[in-house]
């Protein structure tokens, strides 16, 4: 049974790889890959909080987790739940350059040390998620 399952997985992987290699839509191939590896889960029914695990590794070889909070006014707050600043404080490496990087990506550092960006109705939530992820990765990579 295990051998059959293994062959199925290998065949599916080879099939997917061949399709992408023969296809000229590289953007679609990349986005499909990201979609396969991105996991979204609900963390709280009360506040409509969703955790999105992105397929990008931090310096601890963990996937980046961000949280999307659906607000009552229809906006969404995208946050790192304090991970970035906490990591810098644990390593005693928080610098002014990190604060400048946060501002560069239109991210807000909150009083609880979480980083966040708000996407209002009609806004581009993909842009907001992408900017927060880039900010987290940029700061994390500076402190390897």
Ranges and model annotations:
Residues 6-11, 17-18:
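Short, positively charged and aromatic/hydrophobic N-terminal segments
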Residues 19-79:
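N-terminal ordered "arm"
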Residues 30-34, 97-104, 129, 136-139:
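Generic hydrophobic, helix-prone segments enriched in Leu/Val/Ile
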Residues 34-35, 116, 123:
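Terminal targeting/leader modules
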Residues 39-52, 108-114, 141-144:
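Short glycine-rich, low-complexity/disordered patches
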Residues 119-144:
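Solvent-exposed, charged helical/coil patches
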């Amino acid at each position: 049974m295990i051998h059959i399952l293994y062959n199925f997985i290998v065949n599916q992987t080879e099939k997917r790889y061949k399709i992408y290699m023969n296809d000229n839509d590289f953007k679609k191939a990349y986005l499909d890959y990201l979609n396969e590896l991105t996991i979204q889960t609900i963390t709280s029914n009360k506040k409509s909080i969703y955790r999105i695990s992105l397929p990008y590794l931090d310096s601890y070889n963990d996937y980046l987790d961000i949280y999307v909070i659906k607000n009552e006014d229809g906006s969404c707050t995208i946050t790192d739940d304090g991970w970035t600043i906490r990591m810098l404080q644990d390593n005693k490496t928080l610098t002014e350059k990190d604060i400048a990087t946060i501002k560069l990506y239109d991210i807000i550092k909150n009083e609880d040390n979480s980083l966040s960006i708000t996407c209002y109705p009609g806004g581009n939530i993909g842009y907001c998620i992408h900017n927060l992820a880039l900010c987290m990765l940029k700061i994390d990579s500076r402190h390897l």
